[in-house]
Amino acid sequence: PWIRENFQRNCINRGLINAKEEDLIMISDLDEIPNPLAIKKFKKHMRYAVFQQNLYYYKINLQSEQNPLWLGTRACIKKYLKTPQWLRELKFKKRPFWRVDKIRLNNIILNGGWHFCNLKSPKKLLHKYKNVCETDDQFVFKNKISKKFLNENSIKKSMQKGLDIIGRSETFKPIKLDKSFPVHVIKNKKFYSKWIV
């Protein structure tokens, strides 16, 4: 089910034809927003890095209680990029210096941005989960999504209660908007009011 997504991600290479070997390349899903201030923390000697991002579901400030952080946006120097999908699949974690058998992917940039997952109306979430390819992937979803979750009313109630809309054990809590959120959101609270708890 991932073939189409991986192909599309690798098509990013088409836009890199004129990139210089020392240019910084960043790969993100659309809902992963890198913090502009964190980009400055990337240094060329790192080769590769991942941005640790605050993880929110359904609303701009509804944060996952079990998994509040997400390793999202990837960055690397162009000359080290094999493919965009390869970069996306790199597993970043702190490894001891003696693990010479593994690429040392220790470069985790803190306060690296925001992952606004499923920032959609109940109607659009219903459409997504009825059609998303991952729901047929036995490694992502162990079972088919129960039909009891696939209706607008159920989705709306789960969102209001801070529960996962398809019945997984994850829960979400409102976080007060503060300087840890994007400046644009803070300055435009009124505009985004329907997306803020």
Report residues per predicted region.
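Acidic-enriched, low-complexity/disordered segments with a strong bias for Aspartate over Glutamate
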Residues: 23, 29-31, 101, 136-137, ...
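Conserved catalytic core of nucleotide-sugar-dependent glycosyltransferases
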Residues: 1-5, 32-139
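Active-site-proximal specificity loops/subdomain of glycosyltransferases
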Residues: 1-27, 36, 181, 189
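C-terminal accessory extensions appended to soluble enzyme cores
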Residues: 108-197
